[in-house]
Amino acid sequence: MMTEIIRKISKISTKNKEVFMKIINRILAFSMCAAMLFAMVLGTVGCSSAINAENLLEGITPSSVNGKQADEGFISSSADFAIKLFRQSVAGDKNSLISPLSVMLALAMTANGADGKTLQEMETVLGGGMSVDELNEYLYTYMKTLPSTDKAKVTLANSIWFRNEKGFVVENDFLQRNADYYNAPAYKAEFDSSTVDDINRWVSNNTDGMIDRIIDGDIDEDTMMYLINALVFDAEWAEIYEKRDIRDGIFTCYDGSENTVSMMSSSESLYIECGNAKGFIKQYAGGEYCFAALLPNEGVDILDYIDSLTGEGFVNAYNNAEYAEINAKLPKFSYDCSLSMNDALIAMGMPSAFLKADFSKMSNEDLFISQVLHKTFISVDERGTRAGAVTSVQINKESCPDGIIEITLDRPFVYAIVDNATGLPIFIGAVLGLGK
């Protein structure tokens, strides 16, 4: 193009050529300014993801540690934790969604700073009584072996943030263990508005923008530490729905209201039964993960059904899936949840962490868990599923049958995103209402 412009300039008279060249020079000058401005804008955008807080572990390579492959004991205790936490998190007639893995990772990091009765209770709730050392080894290997591909991405990130305050000492062994097993950077920060921005920026970056913040407003003056996990699941279906597969349908909500939804139809081949519910398994691309849906039988209340679920029952249902011909209908849906897990975890058996806690392996201060905040997001459509989760532990100082099976998810149902290698739910939720 530039060669053509030069050729045309050569045919212009000298006087006109001078005028023309002035115009060209102005255009070039304007273009250079625009390019510089564009580069500055890009630079500003790129820098917005930077963390201002000081990472005390930057440049330090985590120590080599031993891991353990998921076995029957780990799968059983993890499934038990997942279903108990799910049962405790369902409230009223609202949609729910949790990531048991995200909550477990954040609490396991926290448990590395616990001792005495506080540690015993956390070990019982998180690992069915296994030591935190064993749990670290299992989770270390599990995180590293979770498959992640272009069409079925799973990413995990952990971080620790603590207040830069005179006299507040965080134990080096606590930070080292969480760096070794959970690859968690340790940020020393002022806990002012810039720290709020840093933490929320970290959350957004590590959930692909699905969750943009975990802290609203100012940080309480008694808050000394945050231990945070972020998890992303983004996968295409093994067989993406075509336009012809999507039709309007009616979804009957828990409160009896009826709403029009986009219902996606497909033929599935894995049938599951779990207690008073039947459902299907739908694979994601690559076959490493699946979507499991459970529709309670007619006349069975969804909340009663959820209350009857057990970890053993869920894993057995998954493992005993049968081949069958299923006409499945799945509604498109998208929603987010924000839950405080305090009451759920206390009810599950770890009250000491929230009351008279012993976190002497974490710091020289008298500390306790003031809040376990869990935020999730999910979107299910014809392409696949996007889901994100963030768990923040806030630490304060004291102050198959015969024939074709029809399964239409047109009323409240339970679903899970499952790791096919272990049968463990990475996410588990319940849809009680959809529509406008």
Label each PLM-derived region with a short phrase:
Residues 75-85, 385-404:
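Short, positively charged
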Residues 17-191:
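Detector for small/aliphatic-rich hydrophobic stretches
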